[in-house]
Amino acid sequence: MNNKMTKIGKRFVGKVAIITASTQGIGFGIALRLGLEGASVVISSRKQNNVDDAVEKLKVQGIDAFGVVCHVSNAQQRKNLIDQTVQKYGKIDVVVSNAAVNPTVDNILDTKESVLDKLWEINVKASILLLKDASPYLTEGSSVVFVSSIAAFGPQASMAMYGVTKTALLGLTKALAVEMAPKTRVNGIAPGFVPTHFADFITNNDTVRKAIEERTVLNRLGSTDDMGAAAAFLASDDAAYITGETLVVAGGMPSRL
């Protein structure tokens, strides 16, 4: 844990947060930040051993952490995630929808229909269905944070269709902000490039990594701590008058539609 993480506040004491796909990478970074700020965090991923390992890492930090196996495309597992959270904590204050896949580097018109379906199902549809399950238990003043991507603003060749699904989350954020107001705020973050397992096919290439760094104003890649801080801000009462917005967290990389 770096020095910045020792100076954080306690904005989520008494709050309950669900974060999907949160046993590593950006999802884990968000769970860690929310937990360090006092939230009871419910983490999830597809594999039990990953869930168990991540829960233990959070508990070592003094965080109240609970883990549930959940593949977000599985309706029963989504429902179980919500049901177990409510059974244990009685409410939901924050939902962070982070699960995503990028199974192809093909051009959009060369992408198989089954892959198109998978991208839509995991990256967009599952977020909607998760909120349908969670919404009856969301508290007054609750918050939803979608994890979009810098690719939403300019899909690149190696991740074109992935970028399109992340663009869809920008619209979903706007639409649900209206639909769920005033009880629940809905926002998103659009991370830049972060060296995680999900992005290692890009960030592990030194030439590509350097080129990405040079596209940022800050001349560096992002970190999971950066993403955790941004998501925590939007989920907190510090952002009480912000809804329907997507915060770009990309070191100044060009990012507007």
Where are these regions (language model features)?
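Residue(s) in the substrate-gating loop at a strand-loop-helix junction
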Residues: 149
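Short C-terminal tail/terminal secondary-structure segment
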Residues: 2-8, 105, 154, 232, ...
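Active-site helix of classical SDR
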Residues: 131, 165, 173
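C-terminal substrate-recognition "lid" of short-chain dehydrogenase/reductases
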Residues: 137, 220-249, 254-255
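Alpha-helical segment proximal to the catalytic Tyr-Lys
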Residues: 136, 177-182, 240
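Conserved mid-core segment of classical short-chain dehydrogenase/reductases
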Residues: 79, 102-117, 158-161, 200-204
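Catalytic Tyr-X3-Lys loop
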Residues: 109-128, 145, 169
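Conserved glycine-rich cofactor-binding loop
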Residues: 16, 23-25
